[in-house]
Amino acid sequence: MALLKISVVVPEGEVYTGEVKSVVLPGVEGEFGVLYGHSNMITLLQAGVVEIETENQKEHIAINWGYAEVTNERVDILADGAVFIKKGSDDRDDAISRAKKLLEDASSDRLAVSSVLAKIESL
């Protein structure tokens, strides 16, 4: 299976880069998945969690909002704010706290924020 290249960038710099099997993005019209060979598109992202599936594990990045450019072999995400939540990391609890704060500050839609926060807490 061919791998998809992904990069997640915020104004302060790069948050994540790598080759992955798939990505699930929080689009404004709902979540959508991307595999290698996906159609080209540019879309607006809402506050949510970017789910990244690598060869060995799933990784998660909370974003407050941004844009994604998808081509058949790569996904480039430009987000206003992002927090990488790495499983097994010593600072995972701190990352989850920062992700919650980022999302709470991102939207006044409490229902949408609470569903994303529930997803983060289940990681």
From Swiss-Prot:
Entry annotated with the keyword Ligase: no
Disulfide feature: none
Compartment(s) of residence: Cell inner membrane
Molecular function in Gene Ontology: ATP binding; proton-transporting ATP synthase activity, rotational mechanism
Highest taxon of the lineage: Bacteria
Membrane-related topology note: Peripheral membrane protein
GO cellular component: plasma membrane; proton-transporting ATP synthase complex
Entry keyword annotation includes Ion transport: yes
Keywords assigned: ATP synthesis, Cell inner membrane, Cell membrane, CF(1), Hydrogen ion transport, Ion transport, Membrane, Transport
Assembly notes: F-type ATPases have 2 components, CF(1) - the catalytic core - and CF(0) - the membrane proton channel. CF(1) has five subunits: alpha(3), beta(3), gamma(1), delta(1), epsilon(1). CF(0) has three main subunits: a, b and c.
Described purpose of this protein according to its UniProt entry: Produces ATP from ADP in the presence of a proton gradient across the membrane.
Entry's family note: Belongs to the ATPase epsilon chain family.
Entries under HAMAP family matching the protein: ATP_synth_epsil_bac
Record protein name field: ATP synthase epsilon chain
Gene label: atpC
